[in-house]
């Protein structure tokens, strides 16, 4: 740790990244990590600037990796160029997870649901160890304000619901 960090370990409005030490949030990190690891779905919300991203990056993500998970950060675009399912699949591929198909795609996977995609693949880290994707949707609430197509929203929520209720 450098001298500047020892003098003032807080970053103000900047967020912490994975691997950095976050001060004064040990209890929150412990509580949230236990909740995430024991539940299918967890919502972390709060005012802007209170440290949600820092807690995830510097606290939760390292613990998730130790638990056999790989964090997959997803910030959805709402411009209708790519549908949400394709964006989630792309984020999984971009996360560094290696994938192996354990079943063939039914229709060339063009209409494959998120549930089918997640269950048709096994996921591994770079060392070939089996891993579970931890899907983290950043700014998820934007879907309610930026996505004007109600059918698009409804279909995405249906797909997420199917995955979560498995």
Residue spans of the language-model regions?
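Amphipathic helix/helix-loop-helix segment enriched in hydrophobic residues with interspersed Lys/Arg
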Residues: 1-166
